[in-house]
Amino acid sequence: MKKITLLVAAFVAGLTAFGQGWTLDKSHAKLGFNVTHMMVSDVEGSFKNFDLKVTSAKEDFTDAVIELTADVNSINTDNEKRDGHLKSSDFFDAAKYPSLTFKSKSIQKVEDKKYKLTGDLTMHGVTKPVVLDMILKGTTTNPMNKKNIAGFKVLGTIKRSDFSLGSIPAAVVSDEVNIVANVELNK
């Protein structure tokens, strides 16, 4: 009986140590993007409602498993008319494809706190592999709630055309979409 108890205790301890769960601090996070309009100006936007889960046992996050889900209907470019157009079948078709997801496949450390984040991005019913730059801004303990926190910046560029996202010519709205995400995680 002692052996079984010790075995169960070791198993539970192993599970706890193996994959530490990190959750998104939504008040300190933004999932943003920008595109070029008419080849002369940038238009910025974000998804106001998104969630991110990170599981990692290593302090440098090289073993992290990252899952992101964003509500397409929460797209916000500070212009209601444009936001409505982006939600329409001309672009995201939010009625048919209400969410976009990202699931990591690997994280490779490039140098000090810089990583290559590889995963599958699904939006508008299309899944494609993407490689993003990820920067670990730091880890610390929040003095107010005593939780461990970590901050990341994620940057990358995708093509609208890869996801069948709008037939508007690139001279009007760039095919390249720059992703800029800043996230703070709690453990």
Label for each model-derived stretch:
Residues 1-22:
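Bacterial Sec-dependent N-terminal signal peptides
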